């Protein structure tokens, strides 16, 4: 009984790897977001699509947040692809645009890190 309780507490204590990413996106915080980037990150943004180092990715996201600050950022769905891959589909709404955002994570050294962020504009 004690072992089951201990395992349950361990599972409950584990943070969802998307929590700091969601907080960073909601707060337009490129620095915090980049702390979840893998060594390289693929960013597919409206004006810019490429693979960047984590530090370059931070600058790209900082510019994006400045141009398109979020009015809201909402997670629509999260899921597990396999034991080392997770995804989230989100809505990113600005004052005059709405994007569907797909975030892909991959487990590296016991931590889930961002492999790719893709923004697709939703047509109204």
Predicted regions and their residues:
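A mature extracytoplasmic/lumenal domain signature
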Residues: 37-39, 47, 77-79, 91-94, ...
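Short solvent-exposed beta->alpha transition segments
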Residues: 37-74
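Short, aromatic-enriched amphipathic alpha-helices that serve as compact interaction elements
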Residues: 14-29
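Bacterial Sec-dependent N-terminal signal peptides
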Residues: 1-17
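Hydrophobic, well-ordered secondary-structure segments
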Residues: 10, 70, 112-115
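Surface-exposed, charged secondary-structure patches
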Residues: 59-97
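Solenoid-repeat scaffolds in large eukaryotic assemblies
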Residues: 32-34
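Short beta-strand edge/turn micro-motifs at domain boundaries
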Residues: 98-124
């Amino acid at each position: 009984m004690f072992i089951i309780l201990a395992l349950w507490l361990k599972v409950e204590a584990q943070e969802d790897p998307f929590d700091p990413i969601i907080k960073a996106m909601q707060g337009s915080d490129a620095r915090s977001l980049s702390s979840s980037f893998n060594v390289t990150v693929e960013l597919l943004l409206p004006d810019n699509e490429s693979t960047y180092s984590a530090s370059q990715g931070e600058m790209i996201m900082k510019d994006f947040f400045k141009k398109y600050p979020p009015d809201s950022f909402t997670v629509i769905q999260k899921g597990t692809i396999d034991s080392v891959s997770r995804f989230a589909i989100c809505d990113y709404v600005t004052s005059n645009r709405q994007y569907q955002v797909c975030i892909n994570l991959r487990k590296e050294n016991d931590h889930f890190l961002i492999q790719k962020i893709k923004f697709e504009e939703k047509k109204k």
